[in-house]
Amino acid sequence: MTEQTDAAMPIKFTDAAAIKVKGLLEEEQNPELKLRVYVTGGGCSGFQYGFTFDEKSSADDFVIEKQGVKLVVDPMSLQYLVGGEVDYTSGLEGSRFFVKNPNASSTCGCGASFSV
């Protein structure tokens, strides 16, 4: 498990996302939960983002801690997310976690899938 400071991170975890995760974890009353972000094959553009809560992390996972919560990314997914940002938005269209990914050459309309 690799933990780094804000300046040295290959991926960013915004305050908005961290605050939302913190609120969700307080509701669950499970301090072991972490937000896991991953990339899988699929979606309309070739790859898709996934978000889940996970109690475990592997020794080779990349971990960012902010606002007292942890974001976890496996090494395979991290290569597609370098330079990106995990954020959270809430608006008329609903609320969701999302990834701003500079490596994506195209994305689908919903923003859940991308190609490189």
UniProtKB/Swiss-Prot annotation:
Co-factor binding details: Binds 1 iron-sulfur cluster per subunit.
Subunit details: Homodimer.
Cofactor: iron-sulfur cluster
Pfam families associated with the record: Fe-S_biosyn
Alphabetically ordered keywords of this record: Iron, Iron-sulfur, Metal-binding
Name of the coding gene: erpA
A GO BP annotation: iron-sulfur cluster assembly
Name this polypeptide is given: Iron-sulfur cluster insertion protein ErpA
GO cellular component, one term: cytosol
Matching InterPro entries: FeS_biogenesis, FeS_cluster_insertion, FeS_cluster_insertion_CS, FeS_cluster_insertion_RrpA, HesB-like_dom_sf
PANTHER family: IRON-SULFUR CLUSTER ASSEMBLY 2 HOMOLOG, MITOCHONDRIAL
Keyword Iron on entry: yes
Highest classification ranks of the organism: Bacteria, Pseudomonadati, Pseudomonadota, Gammaproteobacteria, Alteromonadales
Coiled-coil features, chain-numbered ranges: none
Residues the record lists as binding iron-sulfur cluster: 44, 108, 110
Organism from which the protein derives: Shewanella denitrificans (strain OS217 / ATCC BAA-1090 / DSM 15013)
